[in-house]
A protein has these predicted regions:
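Radical SAM enzyme [4Fe-4S]-AdoMet core and its adjacent flexible, acidic
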Residues: 109, 113-231, 240
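Core AdoMet radical
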Residues: 7, 27-34, 51-65, 79-94, ...
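Acidic (Asp/Glu)-rich catalytic clusters
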Residues: 45-48, 77, 98-106, 127-136
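Canonical Radical SAM [4Fe-4S] cluster-binding loop centered on the CxxxCxxC motif
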Residues: 3-38
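Distinct, well-ordered alpha-helical segments
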Residues: 67-74, 92-102, 122-127, 155-158
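Flexible mid-to-C-terminal extensions adjoining Fe-S/redox cofactors in radical SAM and related proteins
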Residues: 1-6, 229-230, 234-287
Length: 287
């Protein structure tokens, strides 16, 4: 059984400085951010959590929101919890250095997303390599890459470039608003070359189904949007299920016991890698 790391996935803001063609987040949700008063409410809520949680932040793009570095990160640095971030890594290195300096060994995971519609792979890898030198030995660093159809042969070269630099390459199959993308036969073979035959949730994101497995989301894991709404998991939120209350109105109430997963897709690997899904390490993927 995996150790369960209590985790919150917090969408700190909606605004994003990229507009990727394959982004499944609707443009109407890629806007907005919390006020200074609302940020204080979030921080006060995190301070009430018992034990050591991991607060993994995403957007939009977190660094595109001025309040992220002005208020959120300094505030989290004062709390006992771990901090992680998902970023497109477009922020200047000077800003990224301050981010690392503020959090120190509280920084747990930095997931940087490589979007080839906006950057050159070699330049991106060079920047990530520089950033890596500032991290504590306990901080994990990974380069995420969406497996966009008709680009996969080129991504084999990108994967090699990343790994030659001693960095971790983390492929993600492309998702749609209704599930996962249906690759053609040629691309399916390339997907396997990029992900491996039966990757674990720490090696690739294949958005599998955990239906029927005992799941601790809503108990020791939940997602939080920029408006303060808490949901047991991403898929539950998509179906408007698993609502846990709102941070800004002091109404969040977590579940007290795990339950069997009832969904056909888990779009994010965080619940599995944080030990929330019992038996997820035994999943075998079909060709």
């Amino acid at each position: 059984m995996l150790f369960r790391q209590p985790t919150i996935e917090w969408q700190t803001n909606g605004i994003c400085n990229y507009d990727c063609s394959y982004c499944i987040q609707s443009k109407k949700f890629r806007q907005g951010y919390p006020s200074e008063e609302e940020i204080e409410k979030f921080l006060e809520f995190f301070a009430t959590l018992q034990g050591n949680w991991e607060i993994k932040m995403s957007g939009g793009e977190p660094f595109a929101f001025k309040g992220f570095m002005d208020k959120i990160v300094p505030g989290l640095a004062l709390l006992p919890h771990k901090v992680s971030v998902l970023t497109n890594f477009s922020a200047p290195l000077t800003v990224l250095r301050r981010f690392v300096d503020l959090l120190g060994d509280k920084l747990s995971v930095v997931s940087v997303s490589l979007h080839l519609e906006y950057v050159q792979a070699a330049d991106f890898v060079e920047k990530v390599s520089c950033f890596r030198e500032w991290l504590a030995p306990t901080t994990s660093l990974v380069i995420n890459n969406v497996l966009v159809p008709n680009t996969l042969a080129n991504l084999l070269e990108v994967k090699s470039l990343v790994e030659q630099a001693g960095l971790k390459y983390f492929p993600q199959i492309m998702k749609t608003k209704h599930g996962v993308f249906s690759y053609n036969l040629e691309d399916k073979d390339l997907v396997i070359q990029l992900t491996g035959k039966n990757p674990s949730s720490k090696q690739a994101n294949l958005a599998p189904s955990y239906r029927g497995l005992l799941c601790w989301t809503g108990v020791e894991y939940f997602v939080l949007d920029q408006k303060g709404n808490a949901w047991s998991c991403r898929t539950a939120k998509r179906f408007q299920e698993g609502y846990l209350g709102n941070v800004l109105t002091d109404t969040v109430k977590l579940k007290t016991a795990p339950s069997a997963c009832k969904y056909d897709i888990c779009p994010c690997t965080v619940p599995a890698t944080r030990g929330m899904i019992e038996g997820s390490n035994k999943i075998v993927y079909e060709d």
